[in-house]
Amino acid sequence: MKAVVISDIHGSGYYAEKIKEINERENPDKIILLGDLYYHGPRNELSQEYKPMKVAEILNSLKDKLLVVKGNCDAEVDEMISKFKFNDHILMEINGKKFYFTHGHKYNIENIPYDDFDVMIYGHIHQGFIQEKEGFVFANPGSISLPKCNSAHSYIVRFRIVLF
């Protein structure tokens, strides 16, 4: 299975368009979104071309490919405009490895929910990384729209971070 992992769109119509381009270029089986889809949050600047309804329209057009976890900026009202399900987390096996996908505000490299996985991928911190710790692999795709700490706009494909 080929998957693309994207996090922290924060309502950017501009970067939602980039997701369409990524889908066309990579042609993944699944696009895994790690939360914070529409709202920018009180601590973030407005994202480029802040248009949450445009983001919803684009994501809804990709609904058959989407697996989505709920972020700390996602609310019940966001689910009303979405034609896909928001999950607290996603567990799946890919190529014999157990993956745990979450937003990252509750569970992350510093706060592991349990140990029945091989790889944990989470968003929230807006900085991409891949790191091994205590026999587990932890990865973060960074933020597609609002990278922090001088990091680049990024996502994960084939479980490698792609900067653009």
Language-model region placement:
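Conserved beta-sheet core of the metallophosphoesterase superfamily
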Residues: 98-100, 105-164
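Core catalytic region of metal-dependent phosphoesterases/phosphodiesterases
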Residues: 2-94
